[in-house]
């Protein structure tokens, strides 16, 4: 998540305890210890290691944090939400309406966060405490729990915390990638319409890894990353304008005000439940069958895939045909987009829900796909005709060429040249494809950060982009561009798109 190829951590007794907890055999744990000590990876052996740079970090300074909006590295302590302009005074809405900053999606999700039993148990204990005090989530919050492992369900059942989570709306919906990859599913139509009618600042709070604009849901204007227990707290609060450390979450059965500190479990409580409820046999029951070999002697299949020409999920890609297989001219290129800093792969090829009025939605409708089966861009990436229409389809895109009435307009827009017309991005791409016009993209720093999404490179190549000039590229995306035959070029130091 921070751009490194690998991170090395020393091995100690805590590592071995985790291996035992997650069902590893004693012989394997002993082998890890023996190897680590022999290879110089054991904690004691690294005490005298010399490093190019040493950072000193005071663990006692760690407080509750969130990340957002818009970037995973935009950390903010929950105690500083008001100072950062996120939390603040907000008018109580009329009965039946949502407040400013409404949390419309609250999701405990992502294989990263749910692989830590302490995080999940902490969420369950907070849910239990909230339930006992008579608190529940706000009615406009779509909530879910999507663990990365089936072992999570087993230890939540063992601890008796699953019913408490379910009561607050955090029942298990899948063991899969869901909200964190833009696949939360549809909002309640009435809630979605209210967001549109009131131009409401609606948000998502999730325990995922990335929160780039437009990634989580088209109608969640921004998203915040939080720990699983904080996700539940925000589902109860119902808005990010809420000062989660100070404001009153609700009134209990006895008329007492309830704040976050009244619900937050202590480390001792969490450790006790983990010790009693998280067991090695749960992990063995889930993962053991994966390693039992089974030879399938059933029906033989052809060695080559039988392509279905009309499929909207997977069809034969054209990367080795026609213009895509020809030599690049690198001459006479017109700019498809001029972009700023921090363009993510979610800007380049979003993975979230396909809206009916999008280019991909209109294409799927023409192919006879009902709107309820549009699903997400991620599920249709095997069909290049759908995925092409996802290129730069993020509604939060800011193409500096898309100037309307003297100002740059946000959206999936481009300006066709030499016509000077500002149109939807796909219309511009389609026009340039018909003209066989080679294209170039100009951008700022950190181009291509975020998920290592190959379609972020495939899409621009299919659009006819031959080169991208930027102040800097994310390493994996740069490699993907080269693999697709798109030339990544960097400005000389001190030179930008604006100089």
List PLM regions with ranges:
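Generic structural signal for well-ordered, non-membrane alpha-helical segments
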Residues: 8-15, 25-32, 50, 78, ...
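Core nucleic-acid recognition elements
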Residues: 13-14, 28-55, 63, 91-104
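Non-catalytic terminal/interface segments that mediate subunit docking, oligomerization
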Residues: 54-160, 164, 296-467
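Flexible loop/turn segments at secondary-structure boundaries
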Residues: 6, 14-19, 63-66, 111-117, ...
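Self-splicing inteins and homing endonuclease
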Residues: 51, 55-61, 204, 208-211
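Mobile "lid/hinge" segments at catalytic clefts and subdomain interfaces of large enzymes
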Residues: 1-43, 121, 127-142, 171-290, ...
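Extended C-terminal subregions enriched in glycine
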Residues: 140-185, 387, 457, 470-489, ...
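Hydrophobic alpha-helical bundle architecture
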Residues: 164, 171, 187-197, 206-207, ...
